[in-house]
C-alpha cells in the first residue's frame, strides 16, 4: 500500500468503527459483530472502498498480538503450571476430537484426505480475539469456565507449530520442502529467546524506567511486543504465541501494570481493525453460489464444536449453568484458519473453491458467536431469574427490595454483607454465573444478567426499591447504569463506586453525590496509622485524617468545571498547595486548644 492509500484506509477504518459499533450497541448485538458488519460494508464485496484485504488482515493480527501480551502479563509461570491439566488435557482433547470429526465430514464432502485433515485442524481452532473479548464482556474472566476457556485457547496457539509443520508432510513434499535442520534451528532460536528474555528483559526495563521519561517506556514496550511478533513470524510460528511468552516472562516484574497501561490503547484499536478485516475477507460471491453448502457447514461446525466443548466441560466438572457459555464462546472458527489454509493452498492441497468455502464458513461462524451468546444469555436469565422450584428460598424472596446492589465482587460483597447483617432487604445483580449460584446458597436474592438492561432492573424490583448501589468494575458500565436509573427510575437514590478521581468527577457531573473512591478510604486509614507510627498522638492523627478527607472532597468538587479543560493540571497543583496550607493552619489552631484526650491520655 502507498502512503496515501494507507492513510485513506485508516480513515475508512475509523469511520466504519465509529459508525457501526454504536449502532450495533444500540441494536444490542455487541461491538464485535458491529466491527464484522462494518468490514463487510467497506470491503471488496460491499461498497468496495478497500480491495487489498490480505495485506490489511496480516497487519491487523497485531491486535491479537497485543491482546496476548496483556494476557501473558496477567499470568506467571507458576500459574501456567497450575493450568497444565486444563491446557494439555481439555485443550488437547478439544482440538483432537473436533479435528477428527470435522475431517471425517470433509472427506464425505469430496475433500482429499490430506485436505480434510488440514481443514479439520483449522476448523477445530477458535478465535482467540473474539472469545477473549466476549468472555470479558460477559464477565467470564473470573469464572471457572472462563479460566478453562483461556486454557483451551492457549493450547490452540501452541498447536499452531505442529499444524504448520504437518502441511508439507501431507502435501507429499517433505523431502523437497521440509528441512529438519531448519526445524532444529528454529527450536534453538526459540529457546534462545526464552532464556534471553528470562534474564535480560527486567534489567533492560529497569534501565529504561530510570530515565523517568514515560514516552520512552511506552516506545520500549511497543518495541518489545513488535520484535517478539516479528521474530516468531520469521520462524514461521504464531506471532501471538511469541508475545504471550514475552508477557509471561514479565508477569512477575515490578513493571507489569505500567506495561499493561502502555499497551492497552493500541490493543483496543488494533483488535477492532482485526474484526473489520475479517468482515472484509468474507467472499460473498462464493456464499451466493454455494449458499446451502455454506449454511449447512456453519451450522455443523458450530454444533460439533459446542457438543465437544460441552462434553469436555462436563467431564472437567464445570457447573451446568456455565457449560453452555463455555461451549458457545469457543464454537466459532478462528483467525489461525486463514494462515493454515493459505499455507495448504500454496502446497496445492485444496481443489477448486474448497479453500474459499472453508474461509467463508470460518468467517460466518465468527459472526454467529455474538448472536449465540446473546441468545444463551437470555435463556440463562429466564432459567436463573425465574421462580425457584425447590423449598430452599432466601428469606427475602417474597419481599420487595429496599436496595439493589449491582455487582458482587470484593467491593460489592462487603456492602451486601453489611446490609444483610442489618436486616435490609437487598437484591443483587450479577453476570458471573458461578457467583450467582454461590450467592443463592448463602440466602441472597440474586438475578443473573447485564444490569445495564432496563428489563432486568425492572424484574429485580427497581420500581419499588429505595436505593441502588453500583459497584461495577468498568466505569463505562457505571455511567450507563446511572443514566438508565435517572431516566427510567428517577426515584432511586444512587450510590456508586468510583475507581479514582476521574470517575468521581464523572459521577459528580452526572449528579451522583453519594460515591466512594475504592482506594481512598483505605489509603487514608493506612496514612493515619503511618502518622501514629511516626509519633503523632492517635487523636491528632484521627483529626488529621478527617481534615484531609473534608478538604480533598472540597477540592474534588471545585475542580469539576475544569475536569476537561487544559488548565486542569495547573489548577490541581494550585489546589494541592492550598490544601497543604489550610491543613497546616487548621492543625496548628487545633493543637493550641485543650483536648481531654490529648491532656489525660
Swiss-Prot record:
It comes from Salmonella enteritidis PT4 (strain P125109). One of its GO terms (molecular function) is glutathione-regulated potassium exporter activity. It is found in: Cell inner membrane. Its main location: membrane. Gene3D superfamilies: 1.20.1530.20, NAD(P)-binding Rossmann-like Domain. The lineage of its organism: Bacteria, Pseudomonadati, Pseudomonadota, Gammaproteobacteria, Enterobacterales. Interacts with the regulatory subunit KefG. Belongs to the monovalent cation:proton antiporter 2 (CPA2) transporter (TC 2.A.37) family. KefB subfamily. One of its GO terms (cellular component) is plasma membrane. Pore-forming subunit of a potassium efflux system that confers protection against electrophiles. Catalyzes K(+)/H(+) antiport. It is a multi-pass membrane protein. This is Glutathione-regulated potassium-efflux system protein KefB. GO terms for biological process: proton transmembrane transport. Pfam families: Na_H_Exchanger (PF00999), TrkA_N (PF02254). The gene is kefB. Residues 400-519 form the RCK N-terminal domain. The chain crosses the membrane at residues 4-24, 29-49, 55-75, 87-107, 111-131, 152-172, 177-197, 207-227, 230-250, 262-282, 284-304, 324-344, 356-376. Coiled coil: none annotated. HAMAP family: K_H_efflux_KefB.
Amino acid at each position: 500500500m502507498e502512503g496515501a492509500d494507507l492513510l485513506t484506509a485508516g480513515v475508512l477504518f475509523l469511520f466504519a468503527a465509529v459508525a457501526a459499533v454504536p449502532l450495533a450497541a444500540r441494536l444490542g448485538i455487541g461491538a464485535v459483530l458491529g466491527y464484522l458488519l462494518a468490514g463487510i460494508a467497506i470491503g471488496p464485496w460491499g461498497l468496495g472502498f478497500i480491495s487489498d484485504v490480505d495485506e490489511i488482515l496480516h497487519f491487523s493480527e497485531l491486535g491479537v498480538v497485543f491482546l496476548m501480551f496483556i494476557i501473558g502479563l496477567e499470568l506467571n509461570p507458576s500459574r501456567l503450571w497450575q493450568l497444565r491439566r486444563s491446557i494439555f488435557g481439555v485443550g488437547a482433547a478439544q482440538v483432537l476430537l473436533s479435528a477428527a470429526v470435522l475431517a471425517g465430514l470433509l472427506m464425505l464432502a469430496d475433500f482429499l484426505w490430506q485436505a480434510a485433515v488440514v481443514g479439520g485442524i483449522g476448523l477445530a481452532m477458535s478465535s482467540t480475539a473474539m472469545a477473549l473479548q466476549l468472555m470479558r464482556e460477559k464477565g467470564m474472566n473470573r469464572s471457572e469456565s472462563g479460566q478453562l476457556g483461556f486454557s483451551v485457547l492457549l493450547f490452540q496457539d501452541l498447536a499452531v507449530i505442529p499444524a504448520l509443520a504437518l502441511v508439507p508432510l501431507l502435501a507429499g513434499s517433505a523431502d523437497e520442502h521440509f528441512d529438519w535442520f531448519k526445524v532444529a534451528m528454529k527450536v534453538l532460536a526459540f529457546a534462545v529467546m526464552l532464556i534471553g528474555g528470562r534474564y535480560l528483559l527486567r534489567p533492560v526495563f529497569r534501565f529504561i524506567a530510570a530515565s523517568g521519561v514515560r514516552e520512552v517506556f511506552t516506545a520500549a514496550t511497543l518495541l518489545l511486543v513488535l520484535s517478539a511478533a516479528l521474530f516468531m513470524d520469521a520462524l514461521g510460528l504464531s506471532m501471538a504465541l511469541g508475545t504471550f511468552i514475552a508477557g509471561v516472562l514479565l508477569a512477575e516484574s515490578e513493571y507489569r501494570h505500567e506495561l499493561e497501561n502502555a499497551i492497552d490503547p493500541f490493543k483496543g484499536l488494533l483488535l477492532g481493525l482485526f474484526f473489520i478485516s475479517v468482515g472484509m475477507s468474507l467472499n460473498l460471491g462464493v456464499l451466493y453460489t454455494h449458499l446451502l453448502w455454506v449454511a449447512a457447514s456453519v451450522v455443523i461446525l458450530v454444533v460439533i464444536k459446542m457438543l465437544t466443548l460441552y462434553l469436555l466441560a462436563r467431564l472437567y466438572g464445570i457447573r451446568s449453568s456455565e457449560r453452555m457459555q463455555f461451549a458457545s464462546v469457543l464454537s466459532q472458527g478462528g483467525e489461525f484458519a486463514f494462515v493454515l489454509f493459505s499455507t495448504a493452498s500454496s502446497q496445492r492441497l485444496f481443489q477448486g473453491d474448497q479453500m474459499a468455502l472453508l474461509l467463508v464458513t470460518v468467517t460466518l461462524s465468527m459472526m454467529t458467536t455474538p448472536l449465540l451468546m446473546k441468545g444463551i444469555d437470555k435463556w440463562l436469565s429466564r432459567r436463573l431469574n425465574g421462580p425457584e422450584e425447590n423449598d430452599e428460598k432466601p428469606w427475602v424472596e417474597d419481599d420487595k427490595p429496599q436496595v439493589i446492589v449491582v455487582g458482587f465482587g470484593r467491593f460489592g460483597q462487603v456492602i451486601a454483607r453489611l446490609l444483610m447483617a442489618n436486616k435490609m432487604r437487598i437484591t443483587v445483580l450479577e453476570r458471573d454465573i458461578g457467583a450467582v449460584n454461590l450467592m443463592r446458597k448463602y440466602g441472597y436474592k440474586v438475578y443473573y444478567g447485564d444490569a445495564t438492561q432496563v428489563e432486568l432492573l425492572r424484574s429485580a424490583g427497581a420500581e419499588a426499591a429505595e436505593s441502588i448501589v453500583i459497584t461495577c468494575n468498568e466505569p463505562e458500565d457505571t455511567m450507563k447504569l446511572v443514566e438508565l436509573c435517572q431516566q427510567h427510575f428517577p426515584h432511586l437514590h444512587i450510590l456508586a463506586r468510583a475507581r479514582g478521581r476521574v470517575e468521581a468527577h464523572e459521577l459528580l457531573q452526572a449528579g451522583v453525590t453519594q460515591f466512594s473512591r475504592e482506594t481512598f478510604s483505605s489509603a487514608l486509614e493506612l496514612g493515619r496509622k503511618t502518622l501514629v507510627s511516626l509519633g503523632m498522638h492517635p487523636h491528632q492523627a484521627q483529626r488529621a485524617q478527617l481534615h484531609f478527607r473534608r478538604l480533598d472532597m472540597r477540592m474534588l468538587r471545585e475542580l469539576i468545571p475544569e475536569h476537561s479543560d487544559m488548565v486542569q493540571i495547573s489548577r490541581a497543583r494550585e489546589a494541592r498547595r492550598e490544601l497543604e496550607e489550610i491543613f497546616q493552619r487548621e492543625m496548628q489552631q487545633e493543637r493550641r486548644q485543650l483536648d481531654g484526650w490529648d491532656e489525660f491520655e
